[in-house]
Amino acid sequence: MKDTADLPLANQFRTGIASPADIWRSSKRWFIPYVLIAFAAIFYLPRLVPSAPSAADSYLFGYNNRIGIILLLFFTALGVVLTRGFNLHTDAPSEYRALPRWMLPVSLLLVALGCAAMYAIAGRYHGFGESYYLIDRISLLNQGRVPYRDFEFVYGPAQLYGPLWLHHLLPLGIGDSYYLFWTLSYLLGTWFLFKCIDEIRFPTSAKPAIYVMLYVAGLFATIRMGTNYTFLRYALPLYLVVKLNTRFRDARFPRIILDIFVCAVFCAILVLSSPETAVAFGFSSGCIALFCRSLAIRQRMLIATLLVIAYGAVFAVALKFHVLDAMLADGGGAINFPIVPGPPILVYFVSIFICACWLFRGFIHRSTDDPTLGLLFFSIPMIAAALGRCDPSHVFWNGLATFFASLLYMSLFRRAWPIYALAYLLFIFLLPNASEFYLFVPQVRAARYLDKHPQARPSETKIQAFLTSWPGNYVAPFGFRPDGFGTYQSPRIEYGRFEDVINVSIPHSVDQKLREMSTRPDRALILPANPEEY
């Protein structure tokens, strides 16, 4: 009698006893070549399709990220269907397993210490890492300029108005108010990450290990000192998705309206924080309402229609105030990097395939009440964000839901779990963070040098003497940073709509940048050393 591993794949599923290992043994002879063909297509074929002109690296190298993402989704879906999702599922019922309570205060303490250390090293210069862009934008807002209209800003308005509110509330300068807001964002985001993993119902004992792996990978972004790289921006939407598990279960109309209202509020909060996560949340909640609830089809269609109306209103307001402009430009490839076969990208591909297998088997087994499915739906739109500007940091942060869900699933398999966890630790945590430290070491050294040699930093008197050498006003299209860190703010200097050449990526923004320099001949230009490099 033949072993099930020797049976044709379709026969194995008819027996109902095929395990993922059985399917792997029977399919690896064709699946490995299939994966290699898929990789070749994803990494090469997009070079044959032209993309819209921009200053993005992808355009310079002739790589079309949109085609690459479409090919990834196609080969993932086809591979899942051909393997029947490797029968990746569990018959164990969902259950609540709490994280150890001591992990939260320890996590908060480490975040506080990390933020305090970075502030002690570089906070006084009000412009280290990612923070100079944000502090400069907050300063323009404080001058009465309107964000998104008078000056460009690529994140949600909460990252501008939060620090400014602290500036008006407390006796702190704009720079210090920003760093306080950054620290509070990291702390609050850590709480959301902890609660998200703690509250999700899943039959695994590995939740503490998964929390540690996600937490430490995100902790090292403190070296960037940017509110755009904190747990609040990326863990908050996951927590709200987990909260969706209690929604759309009651068919009574007042309860449906309440659930719609709650989702609209959640979506609006995410627009204020990070608009692309609001889009992903809207997609996730719609899929949950349509596919994961046992209500009558008429009621599910009603919920979906009301969600479209509610989200449409939220996004219409955001569009009116130009909050979505940067997201739409980025979606067109304005800041893309080519998708290359680096270790973080490959591990991310594997995590996407694992999640797709689980989603497929969930529908096959009709186990659509799985609390993790909301994370999977959320992760689908976030693929575009992760594989647009696809450096390791963007892959990790935008792929946070994918990594979280895939770690949960792999923790159920004794042999696969340590292999997958090791791959994650090496190529999503250690390798990217080591390179991150390498990139920021020169800035850290510069900050330490100015600490030891304060006379090397231009004094206020010298800067004012420089500015008074010209009787008129100035234009500083590339910023004015006498100490090499934060921009020196002066009402006599016009900095333009864009910060330096950040996000000056599409023909329209390039033309606007050139007009700022050429249409005011009465103003003197402040240029950095070697301006021809720009």
Where are these regions (language model features)?
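Start-transfer (signal-anchor) and selected internal transmembrane alpha helices
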Residues: M1-K2, D6-F39, G62-M118
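Signature aromatic-anchored transmembrane alpha helix within multi-pass, membrane-resident enzymes
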Residues: I23, K28, I257-F261, G286, ...
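Membrane-interface micro-motifs in multi-pass membrane enzymes
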Residues: S51, A55-F74, G156, F181-W182, ...
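Short hydrophobic alpha-helices at membrane interfaces in multi-pass membrane enzymes
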Residues: P208-V212, P237-A268, I297-L306, D369-F378, ...
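Transmembrane catalytic cores of multi-pass membrane glycosyltransferases
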Residues: I42-R47, G114-L160, L172-L184, L219-Y229, ...
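Transmembrane-helix motifs of polytopic, lipid-linked glycan transferases
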Residues: L180-P203, L236
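Hydrophobic/aromatic-rich transmembrane helices and adjacent perimembrane loops
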Residues: N64-L71, L236-Y239, V279-A280, G388-A421
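Short periplasmic/luminal acceptor-recognition loop of GT-C membrane glycosyltransferases, typified by
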Residues: F153-V154, Q455-Y534
